UniProtKB/Swiss-Prot annotation:
The gene is rpoC2. Belongs to the RNA polymerase beta' chain family. RpoC2 subfamily. Binds 1 Zn(2+) ion per subunit. It comes from Nandina domestica. This is DNA-directed RNA polymerase subunit beta''. SUPFAM superfamilies: beta and beta-prime subunits of DNA dependent RNA-polymerase (SSF64484).
Length: 1377
């Protein structure tokens, strides 16, 4: 009775953990048998009560949490703001995903915490509440899904779906939510199946590695130990106790001079408590790592057996127990795949909140600006940062630990409880970080730009993978490549350095021409050496460089002759855009044709002048002949408007549908040559005409002599001698349409095609008719060039239109002579500029065109820019004037004076600007060539900006635009084509003519004025400004304008440069509209034209795919982010972690890649200590280090799951995978071959015996490799790759000593554990006899073996029962592999 009185009376609800504690205390107090009796009674009691209560669960018992509505609403609001930031390019996709997941996770967690108090207050006897919180059925997570919200689900890959399920199961799910939750549920079911098999396989491999480890000895005599220190802050007290209990001390422990524990004493709970209270020095304990042998273990190094609390028995198969202890929780835990919370939290960081309102102050030198995980700006502090918050009457000091983010700025006013800093979740948190790649794909097609320098990743110097050094935007500029059914082209400017990326219209990718196995060569033929050698200068000054670039034909890879090279001769302002034909059906080589865009040197087009032309290869002949237009001559009467002007020669456009070409073969021979055929004779094909030439066609020969030359024509065709009745017109020839037969002729046959009938009179009386075949050409629309140049993006009035015009290059009936082997173009398709003439067109209008170069980061883009302008000054063109001088004013020499012949009104009227813009983009990139077309959807116009006031002295406020007027008529300043000494003119409006010079005083400024400036510009980009009182500085390299603001400007103007990028919602001027995101391509006086672009944010370390300026299609990979994410905590993710650690896969998640660390330790230590010691100590230290970190990693996984596994089990396994070294190179000793895996101890012994260094380094084997590198080939063969293992063993003549369990099981022998263990000791005496016989037969080898194991015997001489081991080791010294 006395005992019972000591027990305390407990009056409280007992849950699972309390039950565990109760049972363990009962066992301590009463022992096993009595405890089980008590527990039986408890069980009976429980069942009785449950039967009486009979809890049932109905749908009404599921009470939803009232605060859910506003919590969800709040989270949605945050997500919306986030979405906006992502759209503006402030955060990138990974940050957005991470933050939105964290928002929802926090919401879900908050609801979950609300759940319990809510039940407790509203309905404490609720069945759901009773069941789940007593631990009977259902856990918090499941109840949370019933009454809170289901929250985030993961997809089959284990990635989070960032669309949370907001409803709970009580309210019911929407359709989308249902589908997403099916994802998660299906994953749960599949995982359970898959993971069970995974866990089983893991167990099998673990057992395989350690099956031969048995306790064979009481003490191995080791002097080493692992030190464990309670002071070290990294281990908690609980883990410290777990580590120590059941171990054996390796050293005496003193407190002061008093010894409280001696070596080889096993540690019980009492001793541990004393250690904790005394906080003694680090405690050195024996672990399986310190044991001397690799193939067995001794009792003291193993410690207590966890089953009965005493030292482990001899003959215990501890290896198998260890393997099963680690593998088994895996199989158990796979059943827990219900997705419980711990998903994707980035270790939700702790926050530091402000204690009171006030101003915050800290030292700014100690912090660095950075981005948080969510892309918010913050400051990072590297050391402890002291922050003071000054309120009205109180100062608070807050210390912020290192590596934290400060979320406020210096001197900022903070409110109480505002978050001022975020402490990084320390490394001690038990969630696993792993590196994940996330690809971001482009949403639209377009051209890629980036705004900072980008490094090539070192492995891919020539590839298209780049690394970003700092945070920057990637821009996808809209506008796609021109896709045509038959053509693809590339554009080369003079002297461009090109790469082999060419855009092919058929393939969607940038096709490498090397695909068709033709090596594409680039030849640069230049008429003069360009600059110094080695400088890659793009030189545009030479007027006639020839560049020939080798686009081989896709059809015949082997042919590389002249036609397959495109010779693009570039005059000063002419581009040729070559088309590329890829016609599979006609197996012939079609030479390239190209669109030529030509701009006159002064950049002025009149109406109806030709902007570009294209030679259609369908209207191309390589033989001579005659063109005829239709039979009716009236068609060739041309109306006045159809006059188009080309290179100052008018051409007539003939409105005909078809024309005819009559081929003939023409040879023009020198007068002296002897002709071998007669006039009017008929010859066949390939007849010799002169010594060198032969005829290509057969037919009638006509020979004429002209001016010292003989012209010889061969007409092919049929000859008819007409009867009396046939009247043939006396014309030179007529065309007869198909279907008309010869009248009254005997053979009235119909002609299928058009024919040309020509009358030939060889003599006066006789004549006959030659019927010649005719090639008919229908003039189709040709290639629709208008699609190349989309109409004006901004749909303005007064626009320049483009007409497509076909005209025939040769007149009616004119003979065409082809020089030998050249092609004759019959029809040319032209683009003609046209615009609506004003009715009262007093002055002539003209178009000013220029190639605009927009330069961003050394990538030059060419636009063609056209502006329709009334010519301000009527001009006369002098015949011999140089090209640039066409626009000189009547008295152009005096440039301070405006032209006096025009009144004020007249000038203002003539300078109203008609903006006609046809814009196309010529890409002049080094790497990929294409035309990019901007259509109206890709551009938008901003402007005009109103509201900048100039205050004059007369206090008149005159509204002007915030962009000062620049050059109203000739397009934007600074984009003059870079032509040598091209003088460009900038007109600025003057309201009253006032003479201005630099001595003017301010009181004269009664009117607003701007003045006319001349700039002279040479091709280097320098600007010579003859006018000293200019108020504009031009920086020629960036083409920026800096406006010097005068005193009368109230606000400064924004600097807008050509090629600048804007993000959305950036304000340019105070009153101006908000921008969309894009790149400025045209700056007008009062407005901008912006090419729309989408920004993608990329942070350092991201990989950019693709080249700068490359065309990307929708869905192409743009960037790859590598980011750390925390795996969700359930064991489904945990098990693969254990497996990765045990297999030592070099996955980034193994902290900083253990293998690399191992190599690092190996090298450094060897370097410090020199060769022989270096290898030994290097390997030892390396192995010790890696062992500790591996054990900690594996424990971390299991602890996070709440599974307790004793360290020694893990240590036994880790010992097996870290105890081998790799022989690195062959020294003098030929004992081991390089690349051989040997045990560390064996390497040391051999090194000592041979007194010579063996070079080796520590390696980490995975468990699979370790299983295949054991002492026993039978065990290896029964594991994996049976045939290979057995074959190798046979070739090497390996001997299996049957020491392990598995080999004996396979062969049916007695296994050497437990009672069978003693048998092994008796058997060993026979081994020693065999050993002696062998020594006699091979004295040298035996002697060497003696040396080898001599030191071993010294060690063991003091230990009883050492006879068995040493003899056996002697025998197996060299043979075991």
């Amino acid at each position: 009775m006395a005992e019972r009185a000591d027990l305390v009376f407990h009056n409280k609800a007992i849950d699972g953990t309390a039950m565990k504690r109760l049972i363990s205390r009962l066992i301590d107090h009463f022992g096993m048998a009595y405890t089980s009796h008590i527990l039986d009674q408890i069980k009976t009691l429980g069942f009785q009560q449950a039967t009486a209560t009979s809890i049932s669960l109905g749908i009404d018992d599921l009470l939803t949490i009232p605060s859910k509505g506003w919590l969800v609403q709040d989270a949605e609001q945050q997500s919306l703001i986030l979405e906006k930031h992502h759209h503006y390019g402030n955060v990138h996709a990974v940050e957005k995903l991470r933050q939105s997941i964290e928002i929802w996770y926090a919401t879900s967690e908050y609801l979950r915490q609300e759940m319990n108090p809510n039940f407790r207050m509203t309905d404490p006897s609720n069945p759901v509440h009773i069941m789940s919180f007593s631990g009977a059925r259902g856990n918090a997570s499941q109840v949370h899904q019933l009454v809170g919200m289901r929250g985030l689900m993961s997809d089959p890959q284990g990635q989070m779906i960032d669309l949370p399920i907001q409803s709970n199961l009580r309210e019911g799910l929407s359709l989308t939510e249902y589908i997403i939750s099916c994802y998660g549920a299906r994953k749960g079911v599949v995982d359970t199946a898959v993971r069970t098999s995974d866990a089983g396989y893991l167990t099998r491999r673990l057992v395989e590695v350690v099956q031969h480890i048995v306790v064979r000895r009481t003490d191995c005599g080791t002097l080493r130990g692992s030190s464990v220190s309670p002071r070290n802050g990294t281990i908690t007290e609980r883990i410290f106790i777990q580590t120590l209990i059941g171990r054996v001390l390796a050293d005496d422990i003193y407190i002061g001079s008093r010894c409280i524990a001696i070596r080889n004493q096993d540690i019980g709970i009492g001793l541990v408590n004393r250690f904790i209270t005394f906080r003694a020095q680090p405690i050195s304990i024996r672990t399986p790592f310190t044991c001397k042998s690799t193939s067995w273990i001794c009792r003291l190094c193993y410690g207590r057996s966890p089953t009965h609390g005493d030292l482990v028995e001899l003959g215990e198969a501890v290896g198998i127990i260890a393997g099963q202890s680690i593998g088994e929780p895996g199989t158990q835990l796979t059943l827990r795949t219900f997705h419980t919370g711990g998903v994707f939290t980035g270790g939700t960081a702790e926050h530091v909140r402000a204690p009171s309102n006030g101003k915050i102050k800290f030292k700014e030198d100690l912090v660095h600006p950075t981005r948080t995980r969510h892309g918010h700006p913050a400051f990072l502090c590297y050391i402890d940062l002291y922050v003071t918050i000054e309120g009205q009457d109180i100062r608070h000091n807050v210390t912020i630990p290192p590596k934290s983010f400060l979320l406020v700025q210096n001197d900022q006013y903070v409110e109480s409880e505002q978050v001022i800093a975020e402490i990084r979740a320390g490394t001690s948190t038990l969630n696993f970080k792993e590196r994940v790649r996330k690809h971001i794909y482009s949403d639209s097609e377009g051209e890629m730009h980036w705004s900072t320098a980008v490094y090539h990743a070192p492995e891919y110097t020539y590839g298209n993978v780049h690394l970003l050094p700092k945070t920057s935007h990637l821009w996808i500029l809209s506008g796609g490549p021109y896709r045509s059914s038959i053509v693809s082209f590339s554009l080369h400017k003079d002297q461009d350095q090109m790469n082999v990326h060419s855009l092919s219209a058929e393939q969607k990718s940038i096709s490498n021409l090397l695909v068709t196995n033709n090596q594409v060569r680039h030849k640069f033929l230049s008429s003069e050496p360009s600059g110094k050698k080695g400088e890659r200068i793009l030189d545009y000054s030479g007027p006639n460089r020839i560049i020939c670039n080798g686009h081989c034909n896709f059809i015949y890879p082997a042919i590389l002759h002249e036609n397959s090279y495109l010779l693009a001769k570039r005059r000063r302002n002419r581009f040729i855009i070559p088309f590329q034909y890829n016609q599979e059906q006609e197996k012939e080589l079609i030479t390239r044709s190209g669109i030529s865009i030509e701009i006159p040197i002064n950049g002025i087009f009149r109406r109806n002048s030709i902007l570009a032309y294209f030679d259609d290869p369908r209207y191309r002949r390589n033989s001579s002949g005659i063109t005829k237009y239709g039979t009716i001559e009236a068609h060739s009467i041309v109306k006045k408007e159809d006059l188009i002007e080309y290179r100052k020669r008018p051409k007539y456009q003939t409105k005909i549908d078809r024309f005819f070409f009559i081929p003939e073969e023409v040879h023009i021979l020198p007068g002296s040559s002897s002709v071998m055929v007669r006039n009017n004779s008929i010859i066949g094909v390939n007849t010799r005409i002169t010594f060198k030439t032969r005829s290509r066609v057969g037919g009638l020969v006509r020979v004429e002599k002209k001016k010292k030359k003989i012209e010889l024509k061969i007409f092919s065709g049929d000859i008819h001698f007409p009867g009396e009745t046939d009247k043939i017109s006396w014309h030179s020839g007529i065309l007869i349409p198909p279907g008309t037969g010869k009248k009254n002729s005997k053979e009235s046959k119909n002609f299928k095609n058009w024919i040309y009938v020509q009358r030939i009179t060889p003599t006066k009386k006789k004549y006959f008719v030659l019927v010649r075949p005719v090639v008919t050409y229908e003039i189709a629309d040709g290639i629709n060039l208008a699609t190349l140049f989309p109409q004006d993006p901004l749909q303005e009035r007064d626009n320049v239109q483009l007409r497509v015009v076909n005209y025939i290059l040769y007149g009616n009936g004119k003979p065409i002579r082809g020089i030998s082997h050249t092609n004759i173009q019959l029809v040319r398709t032209c683009l003609v500029l046209n615009w609506d003439q004003e009715k009262n067109g007093s002055s002539m209008e003209e178009v000013h065109a220029s190639f605009v170069e927009v330069r961003v980061n050394n990538l030059i883009r060419d636009f063609i820019r056209m502006d329709l302008v009334k010519s301000p000054i009527s001009y006369t063109r002098k015949r011999n004037a140089p090209a640039g001088s066409e626009l000189i004013l009547a008295n152009g020499s005096d440039y301070t004076n405006l032209n006096p012949f025009y009144s004020k009104a007249r000038i203002q009227q003539s300078l109203t600007q008609h903006q006609g813009t046809i814009r196309t983009l010529l890409n002049r990139n080094k790497e990929c060539q294409s035309l990019i077309f901007l259509s109206s959807s890709n551009c938008f116009r901003i402007g005009p900006f109103k509201g900048l006031k100039y205050n004059n002295m007369t206090k008149k406020s005159n509204k002007r635009d915030s962009l000062l007027l620049i050059r109203n008529s000739l397009g934007p300043l600074g984009i003059v084509p870079k032509i040598a000494n091209f003088s460009s003119f900038y007109y600025l409006i003057t309201h009253n003519q006032i003479l201005i010079n630099k001595y003017l005083l301010l009181d004269n400024l009664k009117q607003t004025f701007q003045k006319l400036k001349y700039y002279l510009m040479d091709e280097n980009g320098r600007i010579y400004n003859p006018d000293p009182c200019s108020n504009m500085i031009l920086n020629p390299f960036n083409w920026n304008w800096y406006f010097l603001h005068h005193d009368y400007c109230e606000e400064t103007s924004t600097i807008i440069s050509l090629g600048q990028f804007f993000c959305e919602n950036v304000c340019i001027s105070k009153y101006g509209p908000h921008l969309k995101s894009g790149q400025v391509i045209i700056v007008h006086v009062d407005s901008l034209v912006i090419r729309s672009a989408k920004p993608y944010l990329a942070t350092p370390g991201a990989t950019v795919h693709g080249h700068y300026g490359e065309i990307l299609y929708k869905g192409d990979t743009l960037v790859t982010f590598i980011y750390e994410k925390s795996r969700s905590g359930d064991i489904t993710q945990g098990l693969p972690k254990v497996e990765q650690v045990l297999e030592v896969r070099s996955i980034d998640s193994i902290s900083m890649n253990l293998e690399k660390r191992v190599e690092g330790w190996n090298e450094r230590i060897t370097r410090i200590l020199g060769i022989p010691w270096g290898f030994l100590i290097g390997a030892e230290l390396t192995i010790a280090q890696s062992r500790v970190s591996l054990v900690n990693k594996i424990q971390k996984v299991y602890r996070s799951q709440g599974v307790q596994i004793h360290n020694r089990h893990i240590e036994i396994i880790v010992r097996q995978i870290t105890s081998k070294v790799l022989v690195s190179e062959d020294g003098m000793s030929n004992v081991f071959s390089p690349g051989e895996l040997i045990g560390l101890l064996r390497a040391e012994r051999t090194g000592r015996a041979l007194e010579e260094a063996i070079c080796y380094r520590a390696v980490l084997l995975g468990i699979t490799r370790a299983s295949l590198n054991t002492q026993s080939f039978i065990s290896e063969a029964s594991f994996q790759e049976t045939a290979r293992v057995l074959a190798k063993a046979a070739l090497r003549g390996r001997i299996d000593w049957l020491k392990g369990l598995k080999e004996n099981v396979v062969l049916g022998g007695m296994i050497p554990v437990g009672t069978g263990f003693k048998g092994l000791v008796h058997r060993s005496s026979q081994h020693s006899n065999i050993s002696l016989e062998i020594q006699n037969t091979n004295l040298f080898e035996g002697g060497m073996r003696d040396i080898l194991f001599h030191h071993r015997e010294l060690f063991y001489s003091c230990i009883p029962k050492n006879f068995h081991d040493t003899s056996e080791q002697k025998f197996t010294g060299f043979i075991d592999s």
